[in-house]
């Protein structure tokens, strides 16, 4: 049996860097980072056996979704706090894949705190399953200029003088489908060019450069990179763009896009609409009921996502978006339980016999959203030291994002929050 799925472009790249603790001779780097139907067979989605369905459900449930959502909300709010009066976007999925690879090389208390943050004791097994599932989101067929793509790639770049543990290498290859290459980090220019070329290729040009030569120190020994790339057009017709500007908030004016939404959500704190991409993922625009400043935590995002959506007609309005965010995540991650990975007590002995600890974790994101689709990119860098009855007439709902709002780009099928953000201005 064949099933139709309706398919903006999102790119996520996570880059993790390792450097030997002081006193070690090995060497990492400081990374800055119409309506087309896709036909998917039931056989491809699952093999039509009860066992396969159970496996899928078990794997989806293997990640504590409450933990994942709470972490995403908390991190987005922390980034917004240090970027007051600016739009922000954070990619939890990008960070999770970077931390997931680190967890494969961690031991003791370091492994425990990473597992707690990731909401699972075996992120690698989940990563392998998820990377296999998302290949069904891909199609070369274009919809208003956008192909449908959701791809993850991983790589480990080790200095020639650093010996990786066999078990770690095997897990990166088997579970993350990662490639492992050796570099001479003393040749900073060539090392950067090699890593940046990989990132440019795997993010289809959205992230052309991740690191610069001054990011690499004499202690640099390892760089782990993850890229997540998503591209798709909107399902159904494009949004209509207004010809004149209207107010956004109290002080700005902008042109809006209008459309019918696919789902409507409401709780005590917010109203929201979902608009599908062709591949079945969705954009969720969330409007606080109070008109003052807000945090995502205020809006009870988990409760909103778990509430039963209404399928009555919903009219939605929002501005086009084009902005980027850069953030250093060390203090934010330490505040929610990951201080161990930055300390001298960090245990990454599963990566190498040389002592290592995380020095800095950075993330840079970019979002471009218009009437035809969406493009978004994120780079996460962890720099380490080598330490149906008849329906009643529909009620028309409205969600007009004409003042500061929150948003998600969401994998409805597997319950993964790829991006979360807060919009406070249209002038960027």
Where are these predicted regions, by residue range?
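Gram-positive cell-envelope targeting signals
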Residues: 1-62, 79-80, 89, 207-210, ...
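Non-catalytic, conformational "gating/processing" segments within enzyme and secreted inhibitor domains
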Residues: 30-44, 85, 123-289, 309-392
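Acidic/histidine-rich, surface-exposed loop or edge segments in extracytoplasmic proteins
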Residues: 49-60, 93-97, 111-116, 172-181, ...
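His/Glu-rich zincin catalytic helix
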Residues: 58-119, 228-233, 276, 408, ...
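Short Gly/aromatic-enriched secondary-structure transition segments
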Residues: 114-118, 238-247, 296-305
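Short beta-strands and strand-coil junctions in structured, solvent-facing domains, enriched
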Residues: 292-293, 417
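C-terminal soluble interaction/assembly domains
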Residues: 363-365, 371-428
């Amino acid at each position: 049996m064949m099933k139709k799925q309706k398919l903006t472009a999102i790119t996520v790249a996570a880059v993790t860097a390792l450097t030997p603790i002081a006193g070690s001779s090995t060497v990492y780097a400081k990374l800055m980072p119409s309506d087309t139907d896709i036909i998917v067979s039931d056989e491809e989605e699952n093999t039509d056996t009860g066992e396969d369905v159970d496996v899928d459900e078990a794997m989806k449930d293997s990640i504590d979704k409450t933990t994942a959502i709470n972490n995403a909300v908390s991190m987005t709010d922390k980034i917004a706090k240090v970027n007051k009066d600016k739009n922000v976007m954070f990619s939890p999925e990008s960070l999770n894949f970077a931390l997931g690879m680190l967890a494969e090389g961690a031991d003791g208390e370091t492994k425990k705190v990473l597992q707690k943050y990731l909401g699972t004791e075996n992120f690698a097994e989940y990563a392998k399953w998820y990377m296999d599932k998302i290949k069904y989101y891909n199609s070369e067929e274009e919809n208003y200029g956008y192909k449908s793509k959701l791809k993850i790639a991983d790589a480990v770049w080790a200095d020639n003088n650093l010996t990786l543990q066999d078990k770690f290498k095997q897990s990166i290859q088997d579970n993350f489908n990662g490639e492992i290459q050796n570099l001479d980090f003393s040749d900073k220019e060539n090392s950067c060019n090699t890593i940046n070329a990989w990132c440019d290729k795997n993010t289809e040009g959205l992230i052309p450069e991740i690191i610069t030569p001054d990011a690499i120190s004499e202690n640099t020994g390892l760089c782990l990179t993850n890229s997540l790339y998503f591209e798709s057009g909107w399902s159904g017709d494009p949004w209509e763009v207004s010809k004149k500007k209207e107010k956004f908030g109290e002080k700005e004016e902008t042109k809006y896009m209008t459309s019918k939404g696919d789902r409507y959500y409401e709780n005590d704190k917010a109203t929201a609409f979902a608009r599908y991409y062709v591949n079945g993922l969705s954009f969720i625009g969330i409007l606080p009921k109070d008109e003052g400043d807000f945090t995502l935590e205020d809006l009870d995002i988990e409760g909103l996502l778990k509430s039963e959506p209404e399928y009555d007609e919903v009219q939605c309005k929002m501005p086009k978006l084009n902005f980027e965010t850069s953030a250093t995540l060390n203090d934010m991650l330490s505040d929610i339980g990951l201080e161990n990975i930055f300390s001298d007590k960090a245990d990454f002995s599963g990566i190498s016999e040389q002592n290592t600890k995380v020095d800095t974790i950075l993330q840079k994101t970019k979002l471009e959203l218009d009437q035809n689709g969406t493009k978004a990119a994120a780079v996460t860098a962890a720099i380490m030291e080598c330490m149906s009855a008849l329906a009643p007439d529909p009620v028309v709902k409205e969600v007009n994002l004409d003042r500061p709002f929150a948003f998600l780009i969401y994998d409805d099928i597997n319950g993964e929050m790829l991006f979360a953000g807060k919009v406070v201005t249209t002038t960027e």
